[in-house]
């Protein structure tokens, strides 16, 4: 039997460990893993070496090093780039986030391009690149606007890194946009930082588990090795758990807190949580990967039952009054440097505007749940949660992409490119384009006057637009959306049309805001 070498970055993360566990059930696969030279990763490496012997090769390095990336991918049949610095670390150390999410992606792409023959390349992206959604447009799909939230260095960096893959010289690539991931230690991991308060109560979320994500990657390798999925490559996918994992921020907290005898309203207060500037949505195209690879199992409710079964001591929380848990476990986190409440109290205007719309809007939230309409309880007039949750609703309430979306990428012609560009406030300058190869770069101009090159697939099918308007440490979507109906149709779901804020980090890494002129 021929063996296949899969090179992986990011194998020590929650998703990565699940992927290794599942992929190693394929007898024909060997792994080469790039680890940071840190205590936790060395310990994990020793454990895998004991478990898998010479089927796993581990070396220590850094994605910042092109030489390390080249060593990782040399001679591989497949390369899986899962490496990422995610929140809350990305919030505290945006420099580290850039190292992995931008520079690391660039080095991985360049290393794969340099190989002869090239390995097939799978790049794991994130739902965070879409930016905020609420009950006005809870459903989304690949091709929707990519508007990462202000101060989200993770989302912005992953957006930039993903684009490097799409218009690269890699022959066989795939991008998988991972949604929010459920893993066994999720609850405990979120009671040590103010990050939990970034999640609005009325945000749509479609979760996936680490285990199912691992099964997906295993099945991708298995089916591609067997030659069963030639159409998988050169496409972008949303990875979600499907109908049984669709919920909201409010109901996610409710499900987790039920294990310790409480719920969202017992432990939280409306004014503690952001009302916008998050990410996540329900994927209308979530079943594309499932139909190809059959990776899903169980449900959102099953996940929490399994967590409680593995952590019986959580049930001891039921004998403690909710007010005590609220004070000792959650209220103390309001003082954390990553807590929206602390930002407001310290007068951080940038973050206050970004996450609430302003100080007045935050103050109006208060502590009384009777004054806060909860979407999933049908308390928002005109928006029936159960109706919106139904996939039949999605089909008639999707965002426009500005062209005839029924056409495949091979069928789109210049009229489609011109129409899509116009809907984005710009132009396609290659009027001699004819339908055929939608992966060859053409020339575009955005409303800001930037001229850039990108393939029709990157723009029409993947949702990217002008790379010169997307600048690290800067978020100016208030301005950009005014001339870009493609952006405006969703940006103005959570931003007033007269908002004109430029959000940015200064040279000291301080979150700032000013009028965009």
Task: State what each model feature region is.
Residues 4-26:
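N-terminal Rossmann NAD(P)H-binding glycine-rich loop of SDR-like oxidoreductase domains
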Residues 50-100:
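NAD(P)H-binding glycine-rich loop region in Rossmannoid oxidoreductase-like domains
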Residues 64, 96-107, 148, 152, ...:
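Glycine-rich NAD(P)-binding loop of the Rossmann-fold in SDR/ketoreductase-type enzymes
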Residues 85, 106-151, 174:
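Conserved Rossmann-fold NAD(P)-dependent oxidoreductase catalytic core, especially the SDR/UDP-sugar
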Residues 126, 162-185, 231:
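Conserved beta-loop-beta element that borders a ligand/cofactor-binding pocket
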Residues 199-225:
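Substrate-positioning beta->alpha
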Residues 222-286, 291-292, 296-306, 311-323, ...:
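Mid/C-terminal beta-alpha module of Rossmann-like enzyme folds, strongest
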Residues 375-517:
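Functional cation/ligand-contacting sites centered on basic and imidazole/sulfhydryl donors
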């Amino acid at each position: 039997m021929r063996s296949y070498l899969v090179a992986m970055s990011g194998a020590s993360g929650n998703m990565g460990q699940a992927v290794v566990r599942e992929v190693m059930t394929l007898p024909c696969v060997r792994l080469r893993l790039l680890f940071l030279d840190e205590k936790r990763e060395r310990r994990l490496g020793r454990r895998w070496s004991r478990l898998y012997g010479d089927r796993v090769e581990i070396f220590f390095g850094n994605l910042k090093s092109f030489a390390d990336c080249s060593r990782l991918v040399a001679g591989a049949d497949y390369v899986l780039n899962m490496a990422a610095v995610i929140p809350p670390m990305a919030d505290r150390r945006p420099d580290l986030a850039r190292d992995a999410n931008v520079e690391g992606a660039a080095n991985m792409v360049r290393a794969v391009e340099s190989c002869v023959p090239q390995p097939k390349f799978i790049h794991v992206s994130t739902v965070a690149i879409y930016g905020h959604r609420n009950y006005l447009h809870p459903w989304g799909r690949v091709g929707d606007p990519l508007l990462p939230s202000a101060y989200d260095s993770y989302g912005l960096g992953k957006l930039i890194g993903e684009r490097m893959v799409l218009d690269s010289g890699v022959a066989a690539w795939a991008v998988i946009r991972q949604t929010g991931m459920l893993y066994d230690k999720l609850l405990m991991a979120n009671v040590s930082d103010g990050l939990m308060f970034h999640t609005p109560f009325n945000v749509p979320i479609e979760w996936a588990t680490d285990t199912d994500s691992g099964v997906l990657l295993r099945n991708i390798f298995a089916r591609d090795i067997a030659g069963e999925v030639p159409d998988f490559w050169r496409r972008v996918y949303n990875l979600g758990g499907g109908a049984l994992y669709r919920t909201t921020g409010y109901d996610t907290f409710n499900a987790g807190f039920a294990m310790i005898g409480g719920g969202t309203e017992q432990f939280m207060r409306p004014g503690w949580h952001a009302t916008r500037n998050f990410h996540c949505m329900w994927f209308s195209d979530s079943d594309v990967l499932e139909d190809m690879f059959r990776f899903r199992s169980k449900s959102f409710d099953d996940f929490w039952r399994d967590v409680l079964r593995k952590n019986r001591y959580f049930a001891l929380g039921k004998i403690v009054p909710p007010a005590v848990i609220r004070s000792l476990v959650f209220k103390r986190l309001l003082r954390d440097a990553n807590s929206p409440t602390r930002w407001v109290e310290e007068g951080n205007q940038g973050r206050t505007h970004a996450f609430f719309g302003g100080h007045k809007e935050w103050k109006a939230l208060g502590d009384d749940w009777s004054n806060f309409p909860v979407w999933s309880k049908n308390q928002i007039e005109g928006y029936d949660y159960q109706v919106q949750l139904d996939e039949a609703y999605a089909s008639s309430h999707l965002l426009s992409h500005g062209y005839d979306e029924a056409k495949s990428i091979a069928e789109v012609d210049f009229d489609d490119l011109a129409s899509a560009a116009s809907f984005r406030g710009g132009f396609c300058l290659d009027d001699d384009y004819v339908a055929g190869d939608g992966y060859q770069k053409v020339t575009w101009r955005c409303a800001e006057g930037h001229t850039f090159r990108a393939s029709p697939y990157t723009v029409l099918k993947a949702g990217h637009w002008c790379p010169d308007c997307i600048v690290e440490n800067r978020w100016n979507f208030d301005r950009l959306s005014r001339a870009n109906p493609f952006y405006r149709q969703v940006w103005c779901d959570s931003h007033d049309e007269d908002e004109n804020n430029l959000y940015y980090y200064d040279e000291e890494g301080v979150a700032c805001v000013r009028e965009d002129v």
